[in-house]
């Protein structure tokens, strides 16, 4: 089968990482996969994919609404003649139109967040609803909670759930849960409102002086980074918070950390949590979106609200108990098998085959 994936571009983010993982896994299953990036920007992820032999076609999209993308995509679809078009994020606006113009190619759209957030406004929500109800695109939810929001928001009866997956072989499982002279807390994510960096910094600042040997490593970049660097200094923790930027390979940072924190305001199914699980890291995460479908509260992770005091208390529990760190980490490692890239790819293939059989 030939699958054509369409994505805005390969910045560092969960949807982009999922698209990369799915592309490799589909190819390993014997499928022909081509990727279209709307923007011309090359990144470490796109470079890595091209080095691995993945063909990426770039459209040089202009910022904002650019309807010239539709005929460009239509031309590519006619040239490539895919069996299925798989869209991510807001490319659904252009790609489904192009798929219809190119002969009615079946489309699958991964909903990477709760429905209202993922739609990015009323106009996009109306268009998505039209596409879904006409059967021009089939939404796939990342978790039961995301599925619930999609069925309610769009008034749909059938929304399949396919968990995100990662290449678990790239994870480096922890062997020891003892603490060194410095206790390393890790967060990975874009600096935007969703990831709640301000709340995370407040939680870290609340750790008592008995835990003054802690450091907080923040991987990622984004429009709020400079503001958060300033905020860390204002909270008096600038010396202990390390802003490390985007990293092409996060696995060594996960392996070297003592715990992973993700107190987001909302989520779909965070790839970073799967990678932390595959490393056997004890995890503190907010009880939002698909996170409770991934972590068993108190057994494979500590689930909290977004309140800094609650997040801080969970961190203290982990710092104070090697037994708890080991139990949560090992249970998370065992549970990570549910989220392999191969399993994800096989489930998507089932959906592709269902759609192509109906055509």
List PLM regions with ranges.
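Aromatic "clamp/platform" in nucleotide-sugar-dependent glycosyltransferases that forms part
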Residues: 246, 265
């Amino acid at each position: 089968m030939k699958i054509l994936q369409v994505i805005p571009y390969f910045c560092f983010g969960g949807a982009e990482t999922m698209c990369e993982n799915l592309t490799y896994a589909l190819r390993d299953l014997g499928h022909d996969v081509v990727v279209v990036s709307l923007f011309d920007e090359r990144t470490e992820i796109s470079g890595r994919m091209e080095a691995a032999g993945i063909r990426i076609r770039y459209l040089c999209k202009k910022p904002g609404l650019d309807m010239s993308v539709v005929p460009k995509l239509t031309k590519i679809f006619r040239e490539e003649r895919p069996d299925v078009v798989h869209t991510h994020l807001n490319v659904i606006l252009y790609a489904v139109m192009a798929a219809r113009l190119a002969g009615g190619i079946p489309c699958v759209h991964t909903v990477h967040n709760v429905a209202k957030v993922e739609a990015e406004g009323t106009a996009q929500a109306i268009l998505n609803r039209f596409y879904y109800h006409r059967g021009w695109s089939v939404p796939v939810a990342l978790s039961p909670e995301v599925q619930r929001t999609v069925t309610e928001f769009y008034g749909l009866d059938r929304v399949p759930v396919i968990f995100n997956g990662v290449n678990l072989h790239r994870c480096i499982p922890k062997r020891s849960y003892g603490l060194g002279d410095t206790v390393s807390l890790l967060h990975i994510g874009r600096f935007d409102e969703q990831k709640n960096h301000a709340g995370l910094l407040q939680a870290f600042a609340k750790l008592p002086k008995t835990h003054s040997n802690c450091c907080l490593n923040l991987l990622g970049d984004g429009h709020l980074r400079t503001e958060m660097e300033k905020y860390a200094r204002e909270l008096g923790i600038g010396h202990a918070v390390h802003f490390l930027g985007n990293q092409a390979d996060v696995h060594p940072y996960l392996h070297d950390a003592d715990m992973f924190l993700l107190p987001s305001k909302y989520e779909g199914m965070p790839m970073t949590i799967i990678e932390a699980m595959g490393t056997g890291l004890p995890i503190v995460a907010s009880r939002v979106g698909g996170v409770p479908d991934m972590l068993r509260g108190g057994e494979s992770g500590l689930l909290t609200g977004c309140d800094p005091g609650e997040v801080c208390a969970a961190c203290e529990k982990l710092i104070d108990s090697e037994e708890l760190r080991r139990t949560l980490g090992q249970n998370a490692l065992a549970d990570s098998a549910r989220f392999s890239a191969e399993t994800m790819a096989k489930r998507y293939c089932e959906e592709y085959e269902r759609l192509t059989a109906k055509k």
